[in-house]
Amino acid sequence: MAGDYQEWQIPPANQPKQEDCAFDLSVALASVFALRSEIPDDAFTAQVLGTERAGNGVLIRADGLVLTIGYLVAEAETVWLVSNDGAAIPAHVVAYDHHTGFGLVQALVKVSSPPIPLGNAQMAEAGDPVIIAGHGGMRHALSASIAAKREFAGYWEYLLDEAIFVAPAHPNWGGAALLDRDGKLLGIGSLFMQQVDENDTQTEGNMIVPIDLLNPILDDLLKFGKSQHPQHPWLGAYAAESNGQLFIAGVADGGPAENADIQVGDVILAVAGESVSDLAAMLRKTWSLGSAGVEVPLTLL
């Protein structure tokens, strides 16, 4: 299972150097695992995300608890972790939290690597040096810096008040570890982005989900498999921004938007009578109306 991970590497000049780190780099990198999952053909996310997914996961507890990005394990029936020495480790999904995007899996056999300690993403600043670490040791570790910290809204009805944007981009970003120079975990890799600095300069980088979002919900995730916060209403409408307008780019099969006969190309003018011109404003207004099941009036053009 590990062979294909050895076919590429970060150029040595872009790999982190031990002398620049206040921790044992090789030990920390051994705690980042490859993650592979299999999803049933009839799963809700199968058509968009596929039935076979691959990325990374980060060991955060000595008992084998691994943190990853949720889209890798959403609806997964089978999960495998692969260590840097090629050992395949069976695992199962513990939790997936749509609000943050985090996923948790539990290794089903003992792992020998030490967990990576959690850091404080709130204290990190633009310009700080960081390491983006995928499975595979130094060959798959990238020296980078924080390009920006700002709001992020995703068309799949996802919103972070403050995401971390790093550059350059790691080629295997999904579930990768974002480490500070003390070896602490600042976040988990989520997306490839082309506009990541404060001035929206065309720079390739990654969006990272900050680790600070995990602690408030970790107990719930371990006990219930999801956060116990009220669930946001879901529209099943994939909205996008263009030329100062917010429009419908797609609708989920069988979702509320499709059932309400909302069409691709419709322009969203207002939510519950309040004008909205960007995706973040639309989501915040929608969620302010109540929890899942609430009626959401939309004004469309």
Regions found by a protein language model. Give the residues of each.
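Conserved active-site neighborhood of the chymotrypsin/trypsin-like protease fold
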Residues: P11, P40-D42, A54, L59-A141, ...
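PDZ-domain C-terminal substructure recognizer with occasional recognition of PDZ-binding tails
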Residues: H92, D219-K226, G254, A260-Q263, ...
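C-terminal cap/linker of serine protease catalytic domains
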Residues: M1-L25, S113, R139, R181, ...
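Active-site loop architecture of trypsin-fold serine endopeptidases
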Residues: L72, A76-T78, S113, A133-S145, ...
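Gly/Ser-enriched beta-turn/beta-hairpin loop segments
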Residues: D42-G50, V94-G101, K149-I164, D197-E198, ...
